[in-house]
Amino acid sequence: MANRPLFKRKKFCRFTAEGIKKIDYKDVDLLKDFISENGRIIPARITGTRSYYQRQLNLAIERARFLALLPYTDQH
């Protein structure tokens, strides 16, 4: 039981806090924050992103991968 954190940090939606309305597939720096080290999309339950923005985020990452702006895997 000693491994439990003293307090749990409240998750918040980054897009709601910053006032972002639409997620653009060309904003690679923003999209990289929501991709794990091995190239997988981080789920909303971990990032705290609202479902409305998570769907936009998934679509933007898929489009960026298709256009070779983002890699599909970490090393290929």
UniProtKB/Swiss-Prot annotation:
Keywords in alphabetical order: Ribonucleoprotein, Ribosomal protein, RNA-binding, rRNA-binding
Stored Pfam families: Ribosomal_S18
UniProt xrefs under InterPro entries: Ribosomal_bS18, Ribosomal_bS18_CS, Ribosomal_bS18_sf
Gene Ontology molecular function, alphabetical: small ribosomal subunit rRNA binding; structural constituent of ribosome
GO biological process: translation
GO cellular component labels: cytosolic small ribosomal subunit
Highest taxon in the source lineage: Bacteria
Quaternary context: Part of the 30S ribosomal subunit. Forms a tight heterodimer with protein bS6.
Homology family: Belongs to the bacterial ribosomal protein bS18 family.
Function statement: Binds as a heterodimer with protein bS6 to the central domain of the 16S rRNA, where it helps stabilize the platform of the 30S subunit.
NCBIfam families registered for this protein in UniProt: S18
Descriptive protein name: Small ribosomal subunit protein bS18
